[in-house]
Amino acid sequence: MLPLIKQEDIKPEPDFTIQYRNKIIDTAGCIVISDSEEEQGEEVETRGATASSPSTGSGTPRVTSPTHPLSQMNHPPLPDPLGRPDEDSSSSSSSCSSASDSESESEEMKCSSGGGASVTSSHHGRGGFGGAASSSLLSCGHQSSGGASTGPRKKKSKRISELDNEKVRNIMKDKNTPFCTPNVQTRRGRVKIDEVSRMFRNTNRSLEYKNLPFTIPSMHQVLDEAIKACKTMQVNNKGIQIIYTRNHEVKSEVDAVRCRLGTMCTWPSPLPSSWSTPCP
């Protein structure tokens, strides 16, 4: 809840008056709340800098204070429930929109000068709400200046692609380049980029299963053989179905076969009756 203000704390200046419907109201401490239909469409005359007081209807009383700020006498006014735009905000938004639409410097100068005037008037008339209006005007100025000046765009640097083990080994096989044969038993499996010497070793196993242990015929060769077979058949009631798989599917099948071979028992077939064969 808002703290109560004693009447002794309110010390208005002699020129301070409250005018409502062309009648001067005594400032002994009164709050005007009106929501009648008769006040719709009527305007309230103001003198000097004006500020709206909290009300629930369309007709809002006006307070005229030439020199004394309103923030020292009363609490900040609540926002209008009908959502009507304030005079300062409407003037600042109109000036900001005009500055963003125009491209010439003269119109931008007019916008900045108009914004400064609205800031000073809101500071004298509304007291505490002057900072909000000035901040909104400053934000509008930053947006207009940022949109007008665009800096040069930097080109993206092209990164060197990583070395592919499979491509390098295939190129060396095509060129019949001899691979080095290590004298000792070496590791198998994953090959890092820094270990370039491991990529050029003469091995029968594939490095990280990237190279299959057998040669896969190309699609052109398979189609050529299928067409030749169809020509030699010379029948109309038969056909040849070509089934092909992807490289990653072939590699997965090779891994599955190797795992299956590793779980098989390598003992001789005629086992003694006293031995028991373990389950794989």
From Swiss-Prot:
Region (Disordered): 36-164
Keyword Isomerase carried by entry: no
InterPro entries in alphabetical order: Herpes_IE2_3
UniProt record, GO biological process: regulation of DNA-templated transcription
Keyword set, alphabetical order: Early protein
Pfam families: Herpes_IE2_3
Biased composition (Low complexity): 47-67, 90-101, 132-147
Cysteine disulfide links: none
Function: Activates the E1.7 promoter. This activation is augmented by the IE1 protein. It down-regulates the transcription of genes under the control of the major IE promoter.
Protein name: 30 kDa immediate-early protein 2
Species this chain originates from: Human cytomegalovirus (strain Towne) (HHV-5)
Gene name of the record: UL122
